[in-house]
Amino acid sequence: MRLAVLGAGAWGTALAIAWGQHHPVTLWCRSRALAQRIHTQRTNERYLAGPVLPPNVRVTDDCATAIGDAELVVIATPLAGLAQTVATLAQTAPHTPFLWACKGILPDTQELPHEIAARVWSETTAAALPDHGVITGPSFALEVAQGLPTAVVLASHNAQWAKAIIDTLHQPRFRLYAHHDVTGAEVGGAIKNVIAIAAGVAEGLGFGLNTRAALITRGLAEMGRLAEALGAERETLMGLAGMGDLILTCTGGLSRNRRLGLLLASGEPLSAALAALGHVAEGVPTTQACVQLANTLGIEMPIAQAVHELLFTPGTSAEAVVEKLLARDPKFEF
C-alpha cells in the first residue's frame, strides 16, 4: 500500500519508519531545510534522533507531492495542525481515505479530532467524506521506530474498512487492532495526557507508587465519565486507547506530559516548563478543553479540575492543588 505520512515530528517519523519496512511511504515535512536534512542523513535528528529511515521512505516539503498517488494518508501533525491539513487533503485528494494520529481536544470549540475533520471537510469540498479513522494507543515514538513490540488501535465508524487497513498494515512488532468507537478512542488519547500531568506532579512532590496507582485508576473513572457523556462506550476505555495509553503516559520516562508535571512540581512556571520540554505537550490545551466540556455536560472531573487550576490560575502551587484534591469528601467508588 502506498502511504503518505503528513508531519515529520517524532510520531510521523516513527510511523514512516515502521510502515516503510514493507510499504512505500512519502513523509511530508513542513520545513524545506529539515526535509532536506532528513532526506540526506536518513534520520530526523531534530525530533527523533537515532532511528534510520528505510529505503522505502522518501521525504518532501511539498504536501501535494506527498499526497500524490497515495492509497492512504496518515495525518501526524499536532492537533493544532489537523484542520489545515484536512483542508489541504480535501482540496488535493478528496477521494483518498485517511487516518489521523494526533490526540487532544480543541480548546476553542471543544471538538474531538473526528469532529474537526468532518467540519473542515464539509467547509472545504462538496465531495463526500471518504473512509477515515484514528490511530491511537500506548506508543512512544522512539520505541516504535526502534522496532520494539507495540500495540495500538485503529478506530473508524466503518469497522470493515478499519479491518481491511489493519490486515494490510499490521506487523508482528507493530500490532494494530480495529475498533468502531472513534469517540471513545479519542477521549482516551486526550484525557490520559491530563492525568499524566497530575502523575508527574505527584511524583515530583515525592509521593509514592500508591499515589500513582490511585491517580491512574481515578483518572480512568474521569475518562470514562466524559466518554460516556459524549456517547462513547466505557468498555473502550478498558483497552489500548484508554487504560493502555493511560498507564504508559503516567509512568513512562518518555512521556512529555509526565515530565511537564515533574517540572511544575519543582516550582517552574508553565511557560518555562514548556520551553524546557522543547516539544508540544498536548495535555495543556486538552486540560482547558476537557474542563470546559465537563462543566457543560455536568460531570465530575476533579483531577482534571486540579490540573486546570495549577496550569491556569496564577500563583497556584502544586502543593496547594494536591491538598485541595485530597480534602474532597469520601464517596462510593462507582
Each language-model region and where it sits:
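Alpha-helix C-terminal capping/helix-to-coil transition sites in glycosyltransferase folds
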Residues: 68-69, 191, 243
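NAD(P)-dependent Rossmann-like dehydrogenase/reductase catalytic/cofactor-binding core
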Residues: 199-203, 228-238, 242, 246-334
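NAD(P)+-binding Rossmann beta1-loop-alpha1 motif at the extreme N-terminus of oxidoreductases
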Residues: 1-51, 58-61, 88
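Internal alpha-helical scaffold of NAD(P)-dependent oxidoreductase catalytic cores
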Residues: 81, 92, 116, 123-131, ...
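Rossmann-like NAD(P)(H) cofactor-binding subdomain of soluble oxidoreductases
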Residues: 53, 60-68, 72-147, 165
